[in-house]
Amino acid sequence: MRNKTCGELRASAISANVQLCGWVDRRRDHGGVIFIDLRDRSGTIQITVDPDQGQDLFSIAESLRNETVLQINGLVRARPDEAINTKIPTGEVEVLAKNIKILNTVTSTLPFSVSIHDEESVKEEIRLKHRYLDLRRERMNNNLRLRHNTVKAARSFLENEGFIEVETPILTRSTPEGARDYLVPSRVCGGEFFALPQSPQLFKQLLMVGGVERYYQVARCFRDEDLRADRQPEFTQLDIEMSFMEEKEIIELNEKLIVSIWKKIKGIDLQTPFPRMTWQEAMDRFGTDRPDTRYGMELVNTSDLFSKSGFKVFSNAISSGGCVKCITIEDGNNLISNVRIKPGGDIFSEAQKAGAGGLAFIRVRDDKEVDTIGAIKDNLTTSQIKELLLKTQAKPGDLILFGAGPTNIVNRTLDRVRQFIAKDLKIISDNELKTQWNFLWVTDFPMFEFNSDENRLEAIHHPFCAPKPEDIGESESLWKDKLPNSNAQAYDLVLNGLEIGGGSLRIHNSELQKTVLEVIGLSKNEAEEQFGFLIDALAMGAPPHGGIAFGLDRIVMLLANEDSIRDTIAFPKTQQARCSMAKAPANVENKQLEDLHIASTWIDPD
């Protein structure tokens, strides 16, 4: 139907007869000559319709609405000098139309403009409801192509490194760890359910047992969890696993993968090795295991200064096993008012959202005296003030914000406040947001954390991570006692405060795997029922192996400078886990439920 695309025409095509297809981006009538901007996936080209070419042709052009689908035959010619458009790649040429064929018309009112000339902001709910139109827009078109090129770059690198792509099952079994599963009832096996995979974790390990050695997959994953801007119920991982590799080797290989992607997509030469930081250091300095290292305001532990303070909020927090930490905002006295920090203020509210009762603060004055509201200053000695300023490196004009209480809440609070203030004060400029790439490996995660709701230990990553050998020793009889306090050979890759990948060395010893499952509270029968196939495989000569899974949607979001992964997915779900375009999920006929041996107990509250 066409021999050229709209966006590829340049001065070199002058005098060529071309046949184009595309959509009417806009139509303009200038002094008896009609100009049509014709758009396809490659860009736009100006079509000129002259009445000298025939009244029938001109009448067709006069009738065209935006988004009408056309096939146009015409002659490429140079634009007059005064009409050259340097803002678009095809701006030196135009096509003189010889014939216009309408392939389809627009019979409904468009809910929003698709034209590249209209940068109108459209509500996301409208965009998602009419996603097929949204995909015609330049921004979404570019994002999908960037996504394709990212996957293409990853595949090219991995295949050159000897990896093969292997598909793993979508219908698998439900396991108790991690987020809620999406369940699929079995018609054939009444009363039994498949689960959609939260990741290909167990199957990729079994591929290593099977001798594949180097595997990757662009894997679809499903998690029934609460949503936010960078989460979806169904998402895509670049999943990688390899045998006979140590942690250092896996990290180095995946750095090369990231470098290759950034070079091909952004034309940027990233510097390696990426910085590394232990989980403990990240929590101490930033209050989070995915710190944004593009700016300072690091957390400072001041518990030693306040342990015997007369300020009971602080001293009681410390005596109860918690801590007192602070962040320092440079020139905060001029930038942040008391109203914002006190109850009802936006910064105070951020602290409350993280679980804190509030924030305490100190302002450093020009004479290095401190000023505050409440009892903090009254309960600080001159030497304590001096030590505080030394420890925080606070200067005159700076604002110090404090959190006190259980360590996990203090960390979470100051991390949230730190991010909020950095964004609010534009500590990172808009240009830096788009051009600064701060990668960081976070390593040495604890194997477990305590789940107070269930009164048991649970794996921080998953129960298949290998512990550090030096933490558990070689004596199997001591593993159960040593595992709860051990660190995992686990590593996350963080970019600008977002986790883009996570992995670990895996347990390849069946007895150690049994012990880990016992530590998280599974009985022998439960472990056998849920993971017996893995334990059996590990007992049959499983090689040392490890890997990583990258969040493809999140990586593309960052490469595209978008704020939400929904803008990098062709047909995403809303934050209510719905497809507003196809109206899914939806009710089904009772007959379908009967065939599956299930019934719905849902009662519509309306």
Curated annotation (Swiss-Prot):
Aspartyl-tRNA synthetase with relaxed tRNA specificity since it is able to aspartylate not only its cognate tRNA(Asp) but also tRNA(Asn). Reaction proceeds in two steps: L-aspartate is first activated by ATP to form Asp-AMP and then transferred to the acceptor end of tRNA(Asp/Asn). Keywords: Aminoacyl-tRNA synthetase, ATP-binding, Cytoplasm, Ligase, Nucleotide-binding, Protein biosynthesis. ATP binds at R223, D224, E225, Q232, E499, G551, L552, D553, R554. The record marks H30 as: Important for tRNA non-discrimination. One of its GO terms (cellular component) is cytoplasm. SUPFAM superfamilies: Class II aaRS and biotin synthetases, GAD domain-like, Nucleic acid-binding proteins. One of its GO terms (biological process) is aspartyl-tRNA aminoacylation. It catalyses: tRNA(Asx) + L-aspartate + ATP = L-aspartyl-tRNA(Asx) + AMP + diphosphate. The gene is aspS. It comes from Prochlorococcus marinus (strain NATL2A). Residues 201-204 are annotated as: Aspartate. This is Aspartate--tRNA(Asp/Asn) ligase. Its EC number is 6.1.1.23.
